[in-house]
């Protein structure tokens, strides 16, 4: 038996090919692989990464787990699984990220990057919340933090709060009210998220208010997932450590999403669930 693990998202796709013991014997990389936003492009990149990882090895028995952005869109996930020439489970990247971070242990994951999600793994079962995207949520994320500062700048211009040095700086960069409005109409989550590091490092009152609001959202999400006996929290994402709370014990991540996909591919119970 050989195993294939794939981690794919908007920024790229990675694949590993492993022997029966889990030893990685091939790796491949390719382009964006969000199967909900562009199925054909994602399929091409996924197949390219897998073919690169496999090389010229002719394996008769293969099991694969693919953790992909957009896999919550069931028709796309089912179509991809049917297209692959070996048994495959296509799951959300959240599933493989949590398994990679926690291994088989119980715990909570708080993933704070451009977007955000929170998940609990308890007795082998996962439950995730968040991950709705900036328009509907992604509370506490880099995009949410940046947008919150933009909203505060607008409210400051209306007189609801003070125009602090940081807000004045932002408004000057945007060329004032009209520029702020124009930016907001076309800004992607990544556009808003680029302001987050500046906010997290600033002592400006507006930055402190936004940071406090972000941490309140993060605290509420983790508290919602915590069972009666609190679990340790593993922080993921580029902003995870910058927003980490000391309310619960912390535990470093064991591995990444690709590690999680490989572990699930090798786990017999995952294939019978």
Regions found by a protein language model. Name each.
Residues 12, 63, 115:
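Broad gene-expression machinery/nucleic-acid interaction feature
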Residues 1-58, 100-108, 150-273:
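ATP-binding/phosphotransfer module of carbohydrate and carboxylate kinases, centering on a glycine-rich
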Residues 29-35, 50-90, 185:
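Short beta-strand-loop/turn "lid" adjacent to the catalytic site in phosphate-handling enzymes
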Residues 67-162:
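Phosphate-binding/catalytic loop of phosphoryl-transfer enzymes
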């Amino acid at each position: 038996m050989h195993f294939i693990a794939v981690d794919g998202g908007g920024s790229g796709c990675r694949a590993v090919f492993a022997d029966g013991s889990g030893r990685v014997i091939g790796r491949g990389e390719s382009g964006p692989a969000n199967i909900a936003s562009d199925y054909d492009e994602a399929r091409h990149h996924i197949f390219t990464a897998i073919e690169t990882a496999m090389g010229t090895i002719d394996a008769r028995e293969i099991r694969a787990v693919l953790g992909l952005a957009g896999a919550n869109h069931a028709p796309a996930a089912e179509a991809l699984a049917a297209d692959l020439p070996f048994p495959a489970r296509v799951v959300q990247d959240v599933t493989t990220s949590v398994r990679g971070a926690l291994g088989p242990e119980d715990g909570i994951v708080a993933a704070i990057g451009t977007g955000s999600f929170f998940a609990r793994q308890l007795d082998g079962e996962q439950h995730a919340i968040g991950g709705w995207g900036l328009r509907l949520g992604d509370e506490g994320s880099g995009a949410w933090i940046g947008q919150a500062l933009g909203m505060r700048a607008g409210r400051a211009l209306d007189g609801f709060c003070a125009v602090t040095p940081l807000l004045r700086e932002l408004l000057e960069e945007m060329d004032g009210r009209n520029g702020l409005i124009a930016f907001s109409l076309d800004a992607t989550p990544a556009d808003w998220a680029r302001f987050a590091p500046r906010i997290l490092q600033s002592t400006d009152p507006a930055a402190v208010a936004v940071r406090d609001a972000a941490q309140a959202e993060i605290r509420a999400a983790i508290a919602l997932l915590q069972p009666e006996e609190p679990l340790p929290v593993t922080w993921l994402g580029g902003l995870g450590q910058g927003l980490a709370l000391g309310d619960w014990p912390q535990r470093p991540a064991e591995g990444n999403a690709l590690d999680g996909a490989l572990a699930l591919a090798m786990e017999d119970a995952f294939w019978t669930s």
